[in-house]
C-alpha cells in the first residue's frame, strides 16, 4: 500500500515538473507585451517598462526588448563579418 501511494505521489510530482518546464520554454518574443510575465522574455531580451498616461490615468506598459549585451554581440558579429570579406 505504501509503495502504491509513493508511486502515485512521484507520478503527480513528475507531471507538475514537466508541465512547468514546458511553460518555461514558451518565451515572450521581441516587441510583445510582458506586463504580466516580466521574467519570461526570450534569451537575450529583457522586459522594459514605461509609464504612460492615457486618458488621464497612468498605466505601466512593458515589452520585451533586446538587452544591451545582445545588441553589442549582434553589432560585433556584423563588424567581424565585414572585415572577413
Curated annotation (Swiss-Prot):
Residue numbers covered by motif Processing quadruplet motif: 22-25
Q: Which GO terms describe its molecular function?
A: toxin activity
UniProt cross-references to InterPro entries, sorted A to Z: Spider_toxin_CSTX_knottin
Major location category of this protein: secreted
Instruction: Give a Pfam family name.
Output: Toxin_35
Q: What does this protein do?
A: Insect toxin. Causes paralysis in larvae of C.vicina by depolarizing membranes at the neuromuscular junction.
Q: List the disulfide bonds.
A: 27-42, 34-47, 41-64, 49-62
Residues of the signal peptide: 1-19
Q: Which GO terms describe its cellular component?
A: extracellular region
Keywords, ordered alphabetically: Disulfide bond, Knottin, Neurotoxin, Secreted, Signal, Toxin
The cellular location(s) given in this protein's UniProt record come to: Secreted
Give the comment on domains. The C-terminal part (65-85) forms an alpha-helix which probably disrupts target membranes. The presence of a 'disulfide through disulfide knot' structurally defines this protein as a knottin.
Protein family membership: Belongs to the neurotoxin 19 (CSTX) family.
Q: How is it modified after translation?
A: Contains 4 disulfide bonds.
What is the recorded name of this protein? Answer: Latartoxin-1a
Tissue expression, as annotated, is: Expressed by the venom gland.
Q: Which residues form the propeptide?
A: 20-25
Amino acid at each position: 500500500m505504501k509503495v502504491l501511494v509513493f508511486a502515485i505521489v512521484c507520478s503527480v510530482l513528475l507531471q507538475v515538473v514537466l508541465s512547468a518546464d514546458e511553460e518555461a520554454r514558451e518565451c515572450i518574443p521581441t516587441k510583445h507585451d510582458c506586463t504580466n510575465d516580466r521574467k519570461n522574455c526570450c534569451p537575450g531580451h529583457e522586459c522594459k517598462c514605461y509609464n504612460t498616461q492615457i486618458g488621464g490615468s497612468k498605466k505601466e506598459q512593458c515589452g520585451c526588448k533586446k538587452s544591451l549585451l545582445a545588441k553589442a554581440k549582434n553589432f560585433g558579429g556584423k563588424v567581424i563579418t565585414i572585415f572577413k570579406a
